Amino acid sequence: MGFTKILVTFFLVGLLVISSSPQNAIASEIKAKINGLECFNTCTSYYDDHKCNVDCLSSGYPAGECYTVSPSQPKKCCCY
């Protein structure tokens, strides 16, 4: 019983330490400024104009939408 108590105690302490540590694991793309627009996040069928606009609004921009930055690259979410 003593070994089990110690094992459970160490497990719970480890869980507490891991859960209380700050985790900044969210990856973000480098923002590029193109013609006065802040462009980031590649647009897809899931990440469309609406979600791009919502992200721009939550970042403090008045609006945003998906733009083709160059013909050889995919559309990017650009805030303006």
Curated annotation (Swiss-Prot):
Cysteine pairings via disulfide bonds: C39-C79, C43-C66, C52-C77, C56-C78
Signal peptide feature range: 1-27
Keywords for this protein: Antimicrobial, Disulfide bond, Fungicide, Plant defense, Secreted, Signal
Secreted listed as a keyword: yes
Highest taxon of the lineage: Eukaryota
This protein's record includes keyword Disulfide bond: yes
One of the GO BP terms on file: defense response to fungus
Protein's name according to its UniProt entry: Defensin-like protein 51
Species this protein is from: Arabidopsis thaliana
